[in-house]
């Protein structure tokens, strides 16, 4: 079962795959069902559930997006397509790994 509010995503938009959680203290791992088409359905160039990613939380996602743009780093802004309470963006690190940065939204 999901333990966070999902957006009104369907199989045509957003992401409605199954997600499992493993928690140890303040650390949490999400195991998400692979979806090769989520980027295309959302008009984005990065697919965070194609091969996995690592995530970090921020208190100011707009400042983080401005920092990425100022440094010429492209990112995909999924907003709340995956989780109703989290604004998520994704970008590639220099090694080609997908990085997520998210902020809780009210």
Residue ranges and their predicted role:
Residues 3-5, 51-56, 105-106:
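N-terminal beta-strand motif that seeds the catalytic metal site of vicinal oxygen chelate
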Residues 26-29, 39-40, 96-98:
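Short, charged/polar, Gly/Pro-enriched secondary-structure boundary elements
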Residues 1-28:
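Core segments of cupin and vicinal oxygen chelate
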């Amino acid at each position: 079962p999901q333990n966070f509010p999902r957006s009104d995503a369907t199989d045509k938009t957003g992401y409605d795959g199954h997600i499992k959680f493993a928690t140890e203290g303040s650390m949490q791992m999400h195991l998400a069902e692979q979806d090769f088409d989520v980027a295309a359905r959302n008009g984005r160039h990065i697919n965070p559930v194609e091969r996995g990613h690592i995530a970090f939380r921020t208190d100011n996602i707009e400042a983080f997006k401005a920092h990425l743009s100022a440094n010429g780093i492209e990112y995909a802004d999924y907003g709340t397509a995956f989780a109703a309470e989290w604004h998520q963006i994704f970008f590639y690190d220099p090694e080609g790994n997908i990085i997520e940065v998210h902020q809780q939204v009210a």
